[in-house]
A protein has these predicted regions:
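Conserved SAM-binding loop of SAM-dependent methyltransferases across substrates and taxa
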Residues: 93-105
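A short glycine-rich, Lys/Arg-flanked "PGG" loop and its adjoining helix->strand segment in the class I
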Residues: 178-190
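Conserved SAM/SAH-binding beta-strand->alpha-helix loop
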Residues: 115-116
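Conserved class I S-adenosyl-L-methionine
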Residues: 83-92
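Substrate-binding/catalytic lobe of Class I Rossmann-like enzymes that use SAM or dcSAM, i.e.
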Residues: 208-289, 297-303
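Conserved beta-strand signature within the Rossmann-like core of class I S-adenosyl-L-methionine
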Residues: 187-201
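N-terminal auxiliary segments of SAM/dcSAM-dependent transferases
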Residues: 1-40, 47
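Class I SAM-dependent methyltransferase Rossmann-like catalytic core
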Residues: 34-80
Length: 326
């Protein structure tokens, strides 16, 4: 059998032509306060750095959520449909999904991620470890366009369980989070479920340390986005002319990650387009909203889902919510 036949199925639902994606990126950089969509963090190097972030002492979300899952895995699995289609949104290296396979016994694993090459290697590793399990990779900017109806309809007797761990939902503005969860709801039918992690409100010092670690890994991750922009736009950002900045905004209840210009300079963004940065000028790269448990339940309800079960840690730092169609 050829190597190609051994590889798991890989599909793409990317909708915008590359030129339109570039135009959106350029428009964000030309706003009065420049913006770069956080999806551009995740080139191959960015994925590697984020994996490193998840191992940091300061970055509590990963280990706290992992402990909640470890302590409650069987109880959570007992609330899920039998032999579901396990849909891992933003699956990365698929490590979190691997930990669920024995407990959930899915009929199929669907890994969804925007980083195509990284996704292919990740889903192939799952397929190699579980040769009897159907594994499908979907290259998708799923935060904007979730289009899995046809794929899920191939197995009408296996309802989907959407798995969205890691508090990534916090990267959306609350209204955008509602619209995103509504798109998940539209894929659930009557029996589908959403298993989602959300970071909870806590003291500012703990939050800020998680996004500005002493060893500088998060800073490297944030600065790497400029290398991605250079590749996408043929721009000439020099990352060394910016520094990482992360603070908690009390009014909006969110961490804000930015890049701050160290000095006045100019950047070529496109062939005939330049952007001038003054010293101290910011580029917004990420928001991470924090919720109380009740606020997040209300968000699920506004999105057409009912929270049926909730698990947290001893300190109430992180919440895992299981929701079904309302």
């Amino acid at each position: 059998m050829s190597l190609a036949l051994d590889l798991p199925r890989l599909e793409s639902t990317l909708r915008l032509p590359v030129q339109d994606e570039r135009q959106q990126l350029l428009q964000g950089l030309l706003q009065p306060t420049a913006r770069i969509d956080s999806k551009y963090f995740y080139d191959e190097r960015g994925c590697e750095l984020f994996t490193d972030i998840c191992r940091l002492d300061e970055y509590y979300p990963t280990r706290t959520e992992a402990q909640i899952f470890s302590d409650n895995r069987e109880a959570i699995a007992a609330q899920l449909p039998d032999t579901p289609q396990w849909v891992d949104l933003g699956c990365g290296d698929c490590n979190k999904t691997r930990q669920w396979l024995d407990a959930v016994d899915p009929a199929r694993v669907v890994g969804v991620d925007i980083a195509g090459e990284f996704l292919q290697s990740s889903i192939a590793a799952v397929a190699q470890q579980h040769p009897q399990l159907e594994c499908v990779g979907v290259v998708s900017d799923f935060t904007q366009h979730l289009e899995l109806h046809d794929l899920l309809a191939e197995r009408p007797n296996n309802p989907p369980v959407f798995f969205y761990p890691g508090s990534s939902i916090g990267n959306f503005e609350p209204r955008a989070a509602m619209h995103f969860i509504r798109r998940i709801r539209a894929h659930c039918g009557e029996q589908g479920r959403l298993l989602i992690g959300a970071d909870l409100l806590k003291p500012r010092a703990i939050l800020e340390a998680a996004y500005d670690d002493a060893s500088g890994v998060t800073a490297a991750f944030n600065l790497n986005i400029l290398n991605v922009v250079n590749q996408e736009l043929d721009a000439d950002f020099r990352p060394e002319l910016f520094h990482h900045w992360a603070r908690f905004d009390d009014e909006h209840r969110r961490i804000e990650m930015r890049l701050v210009a160290r000095e006045r300079h100019s950047v070529r963004l496109a062939r005939h387009t330049r952007r001038h940065f003054e010293a101290g000028e910011h580029i917004v790269t990420e928001y991470s909203h924090k919720y109380s448990a009740d606020e997040f339940r209300a968000l699920l309800a506004a999105s057409g889902l009912r929270c049926t079960h909730y698990w947290t840690d001893a300190q109430d730092w992180f919440g895992v919510f299981l929701a079904e169609p309302a």
